[in-house]
Regions:
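Short loop/helix-cap segments at secondary-structure boundaries that form the rim of catalytic
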Residues: 5-15, 85-94, 127
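Acidic donor-binding loop of glycosyltransferase active sites
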Residues: 98, 110-125, 132-133
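Short acidic/histidine- and often glycine-rich active-site loop of Leloir-type glycosyltransferases
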Residues: 126-129, 145-158
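A short, well-ordered alpha-helix in the C-terminal region of glycosyltransferases
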Residues: 186-198
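C-terminal alpha-helical cap of glycosyltransferases
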Residues: 197-214
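Donor-nucleotide binding loops and adjacent catalytic segments primarily
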Residues: 31-33, 40-114, 149-151, 157, ...
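Short hydrophobic beta-strand element within catalytic cores of glycosyltransferases
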Residues: 117, 133-145
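Active-site-proximal region of nucleotide-activated glycan assembly enzymes
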Residues: 1-32
């Protein structure tokens, strides 16, 4: 299972918390290549914003509204979604925006010091496996079946993530969350590394081998 809440819903000794297997190429990213791809350097930490394939109007607006302040201390990679590019920001030092990234994504993950993301199960498990401090902004209950909210709250309870409800996302709340998570980043990193999510495939294989021996 992926969440401890799921284990509690199943018969005793019938479920094991393993985390979700992730794409192995994500674990082989090169931070230097990620910085080079974006035209960044190692002088400032990097925030990676992932708004999903369609992007999030609320998240995009909040990020861009605090960009001048963010760029004093951070560099920002913004995956803003299809048709969500802001041409007026092209050429802004320390900021790059893309509708979507595929092949270079492992390198961008490796370069990131903090990630802002939606809370789909696959996305958050990838973030956890990489032990990247993160802020999760789940789809609202009005725009989804509510699963992202449950995912995000579970990760928050386990100490892996900071959660902002989409309805509360604005310049002030986002900037405050970024400062809080970055200042306490090692606490989040330690919690994720202890979770075992960094080697979900290995844990699942071990369970299968154990069952074969019985």
């Amino acid at each position: 299972c992926n969440f401890p809440e799921t284990v509690k819903c199943l018969p005793e000794n019938k479920a094991v918390l393993t985390g979700t297997p992730i794409r192995q190429e994500l674990l082989s990213g090169d931070a230097r290549e990620g910085l080079k791809f974006c035209g960044f350097n190692a002088a400032k930490p990097v925030i990676l914003v992932i708004g999903g394939s369609l992007g999030s109007v609320a998240v995009n607006h909040a990020v861009r509204s605090i960009l001048p302040e963010l760029l004093k201390d951070f560099q920002v990679i913004h995956l803003c979604g299809k048709d969500k590019l802001d041409a007026s920001l092209n050429g802004t030092e320390g900021y790059v925006q893309f509708e979507y990234i595929k092949d270079e994504l492992p390198d961008l993950f490796a370069a990131a010091d903090l990630i802002i993301s939606r809370a789909g199960a696959n996305a958050i498990c990838e973030i956890s496996a990489l032990a990247k401090p993160n802020i999760l902004i789940p789809l609202s209950a009005n725009a989804s079946r509510g699963d992202q909210i449950l995912n995000a709250r579970s990760f928050e309870r386990q100490g892996y993530s900071k959660v902002l409800e989409e309805e509360s996302v604005n310049a002030q709340t986002l900037q405050s969350a970024i400062r809080e998570v970055y200042e306490n980043r090692q606490t989040y990193i330690n919690a994720m590394k202890k979770s075992g999510h960094t080697d979900s495939i290995g844990r699942i294989l071990s369970l299968i081998q154990e069952c074969e021996r019985k």
